[in-house]
């Protein structure tokens, strides 16, 4: 009991220190980019969320857009088979909240940003909502949120779980201090055997662990619409043009690609730059200007009729807009401090996939893609040659598309396995 109390106080102190260290960056985003203004009352516990109706409640949580998006087939199936349940969906980012509202409010879900995990804030929210089940997407588990839910009698599950090598070392250190961070979880449904070994290394019993594959490979028919013609028309791309979509781009990705794009000046190759963070838009623009690349902004009505390069300065469209591409690159993979983003979205839109050398956030998936030749791993030296070959050789592009489709087909049963495991837990509960 004393150790648990001490751990909670130390954790609170760590969060407070982290807040003050991050405060300058946070306030910069508030005053110069208008971020967090709509969500601060919920984040700091000034305003408490309210869930309508009666009946059992399941609380889903994911860090941001990707983690909450993969919940879509799960919520749809849950609503079909257990309509008496109420849904709550939380996320840590404003972009994630916008995505969750678009996807889940029509299903009757209550969506809001997750309050800060300080014990004086999150515990009162958990007590008010009193969830019967809490489901964490991929690994964004928060200590007080998890432990307070368990104290009130909730079941807690991790789905599509993963644990990086860096995180494994960090949680192994906590284990040596006598704290198993993930111990309160009832079940861990993981993407891969490697992640299973890492969770076992930090003290999780194998009896709690199921390996089902990556849920992101599952495409619900209602979500699999390929809007290639729609987006190519909106972007004003002719049938002779070839489009490269550079998704989730960070400044270091832009630096590498700017050198390559300069070789396609005045050609039929069009480049769509999609920043990961809109607050870095000016930095992206300066890098393109420095490289002598003329570009337009989507928000200002620019199109490929006027420019060979466009910056897509709008949130929430990347996954859909991949469908317009002839080649796609996933950003964050030329930046060792980032380590990549969702590699599956281009494949789901039947587009050849490229990614850089830094992909440790999804290293297992990246290795699978390389083994199946469903994705191209490139570096600064090979990038221009690979892009040129794909642009000039339609057969090669089609071969990568087919290999991507085959890869997704082999992995698509992961959702069904995950659902069957969760369903068995739901039906056993006495609500």
Swiss-Prot record:
Lineage of source species:
Bacteria, Pseudomonadati, Chlamydiota, Chlamydiia, Chlamydiales
* Example of a GO MF term: Kdo transferase activity
Source organism of this protein record? Chlamydia trachomatis serovar D (strain ATCC VR-885 / DSM 19411 / UW-3/Cx)
Output this protein's name: 3-deoxy-D-manno-octulosonic acid transferase
Q: What does this protein do?
A: Involved in lipopolysaccharide (LPS) biosynthesis. Catalyzes the transfer of three 3-deoxy-D-manno-octulosonate (Kdo) residues from CMP-Kdo to lipid IV(A), the tetraacyldisaccharide-1,4'-bisphosphate precursor of lipid A. Thus generates the genus-specific LPS epitope of Chlamydia, composed of the trisaccharide alpha-Kdo-(2->8)-alpha-Kdo-(2->4)-alpha-Kdo.
- Report which reactions are catalysed by this protein: lipid IVA (E. coli) + CMP-3-deoxy-beta-D-manno-octulosonate = alpha-Kdo-(2->6)-lipid IVA (E. coli) + CMP + H(+); alpha-Kdo-(2->6)-lipid IVA (E. coli) + CMP-3-deoxy-beta-D-manno-octulosonate = alpha-Kdo-(2->4)-alpha-Kdo-(2->6)-lipid IVA (E. coli) + CMP + H(+); alpha-Kdo-(2->4)-alpha-Kdo-(2->6)-lipid IVA (E. coli) + CMP-3-deoxy-beta-D-manno-octulosonate = alpha-Kdo-(2->8)-alpha-Kdo-(2->4)-alpha-Kdo-(2->6)-lipid IVA (E. coli) + CMP + H(+)
Site description Transition state stabilizer, residues in chain: 138, 216
Q: Where is the active site?
A: 67 (proton acceptor)
**UniProt cross-references to InterPro entries, sorted A to Z:** Glycos_transf_N, Glycos_transf_N_sf, Kdotransferase
Q: Which residues cross the membrane?
A: 5-27
For this chain, the family text in UniProt reads: Belongs to the glycosyltransferase group 1 family. Glycosyltransferase 30 subfamily.
Listed binding positions for CMP are: 275-276, 315-317, 342-345
Q: What does the entry give for GO biological process?
A: lipid A biosynthetic process; lipopolysaccharide core region biosynthetic process
